[in-house]
A protein has these predicted regions:
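Catalytic core of membrane glycerolipid acyltransferases/transacylases, capturing the structured
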Residues: 1-8
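Non-catalytic C-terminal accessory region of glycerolipid acyltransferases
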Residues: 9-137
Length: 137
């Protein structure tokens, strides 16, 4: 457990460094801390403060993304490439403005607020997908 925590802290520091100084890098991150295993692509787990901490400290450009159509069974997902499996739909939002958070105190509360705000933006993209997908059923 102690080794895992030490590795997690190292990973967060490294991620902050890459976000701050690694121009041109694209990093995908689940604000929930992991992928939801729900079959409903529009239900999310609660946002965790970890990505908020990374964003607060590195102040990178943040683009929300909503992805649906990926399943939790890798073998079926790969097989779907040949058998016409479910289409993967990806929605990219506009870069989001986070300056209002950078003037707040560096705290877990602020990190959580950033993560929640990001999840709201991802949820908005999910609602666009739902409206578009339901209209074409």
């Amino acid at each position: 457990e102690a080794n895992k925590r030490a590795f997690d802290k190292f990973s967060v520091r490294e991620l902050i460094h890459i976000c701050r100084y690694g121009r041109g890098h694209v990093i995908g991150f689940h604000p929930e801390g992991k992928r939801s295993l729900s079959s409903d692509p529009y239900s999310f787990l609660p946002a965790q403060p970890g990505i908020g901490k990374v964003i607060y400290e590195a102040q990178p450009q943040v683009v929300p993304v909503f992805i649906t159509g990926l399943r939790n069974e890798l073998a079926k997902q790969i097989l779907g490439n040949w058998t016409g499996g479910e289409k993967v739909r990806i929605w990219f939002g506009e870069p989001i403005e986070l300056n209002e958070f950078y003037t707040k105190r560096d705290s877990v509360r602020t990190h959580k607020e950033i993560s929640d705000f990001l999840m709201t933006k991802i949820g908005e993209l999910g609602e666009k997908d739902r409206a578009e997908f339901e209209a074409h059923k």
